């Protein structure tokens, strides 16, 4: 199947949702060679991935995942694509923890280093959190605490068949956007930052196709895969039936514009210390962006409109 798909994509034709799903299923089962996987990923990247192709690929990822079964209603995920190269503090991680502490049920899906010098797994370990690979225990913690981190390699073991081709390519591919679309706890309310403005509306439509109840997808000034307090943020909101696209500014929320340097991160120890400072009540640009992101996560849970639109 993958060879047929490669030929079709090289000729500039789009795959159907079913075709993309079938190719990804074959990759997840280890039925494609590393060379075939690499060729497919590059061909798809050069053509440009469509909503149908991303949706089908995400469906295959979900099917192959080790799921966390829980009765918790209204789960929210704040996973983003990473890969913006900005090396900020872990904004979505801090926001997820604040939202969880405020009563939002957060199933945060994530991995290790992508856009920051450390990502959620690294900073949570620096904060003393143990990464769990027991879905039953994860469900228990989520239900009792209101927050659980779902470490992607524990839940998407079939991804091992694409690891080496991706590593050797060193390019962004469709896999870079599949993480936020493949939450192992089935979160249907999402706040998703993307590394490319061109992906904002596309990802919102994909989330709608995948059954999301509500979603905010955004790309911020400074090239951030985050809500930005540096300048304008482009947002695509999946309302449950349609996609609304708009832009917000820091001033809309009464926030003073920040600089990229204000939000700069470091290694896991540095970022963990920054998060502790925010939690201790320190005010400033890092706290501002954390609270703004948190309000978006809370809005996804409570169906409150994004303030200042």
Task: Annotate the PLM regions.
Residues 36, 91-95, 119-120, 199, ...:
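Catalytic-loop motifs flanking and including active-site residues across diverse enzymes
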Residues 40, 83, 124, 179, ...:
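Residue-level signature of catalytic and energy-coupling elements of molecular machines
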Residues 41, 89-145:
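A glycine-rich phosphate/pyrophosphate-binding beta-strand-loop-alpha-helix module
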Residues 80-85, 110-116, 155, 221-222:
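Acidic, glycine-rich active-site loops and adjacent beta-strand->loop/helix elements
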Residues 4, 8, 14-15, 63-66, ...:
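Glycine-rich anion-binding loops and their surrounding alpha/beta cores
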């Amino acid at each position: 199947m993958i060879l047929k798909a490669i030929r079709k994509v090289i000729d500039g034709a789009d795959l159907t949702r079913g075709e993309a799903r079938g190719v990804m299923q074959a990759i997840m089962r280890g039925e494609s060679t590393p060379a075939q996987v690499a060729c497919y990923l590059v061909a798809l990247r050069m053509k440009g991935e469509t909503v149908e192709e991303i949706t089908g690929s995400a469906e295959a990822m979900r099917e192959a995942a080790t799921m966390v079964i829980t009765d918790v209603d209204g789960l929210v995920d704040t996973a983003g694509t990473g890969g913006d190269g900005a090396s900020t503090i872990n904004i979505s991680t801090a926001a997820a923890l604040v939202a969880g502490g405020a009563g939002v049920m957060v199933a945060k899906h994530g991995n290790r280093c992508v856009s920051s010098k450390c990502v959620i797994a690294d900073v949570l370990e620096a904060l003393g959190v143990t990464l769990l690979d027991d879905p039953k225990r994860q469900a228990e913690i989520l239900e009792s605490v209101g927050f659980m981190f779902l470490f992607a390699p524990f839940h998407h073991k079939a991804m091992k068949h694409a690891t080496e081709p991706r590593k050797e390519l060193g390019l962004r591919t469709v896999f870079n956007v599949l993480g936020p679309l493949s939450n192992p706890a089935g979160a249907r309310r999402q706040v998703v930052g993307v590394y490319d403005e061109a992906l904002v509306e596309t990802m919102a439509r994909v989330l709608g196709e995948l059954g999301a109840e509500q979603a905010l997808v955004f790309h911020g000034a400074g090239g951030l895969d985050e809500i930005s307090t540096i300048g304008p943020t482009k947002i695509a909101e999946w309302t449950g039936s349609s996609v609304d696209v708009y832009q917000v500014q820091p001033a809309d929320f009464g926030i003073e514009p920040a600089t990229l340097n204000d939000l700069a991160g470091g290694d896991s120890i540095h970022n963990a210390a920054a998060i502790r400072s925010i939690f201790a009540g320190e005010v400033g640009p890092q706290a501002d962006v954390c609270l703004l992101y948190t309000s978006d996560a809370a809005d996804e849970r409570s169906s409150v409109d994004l303030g200042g639109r």
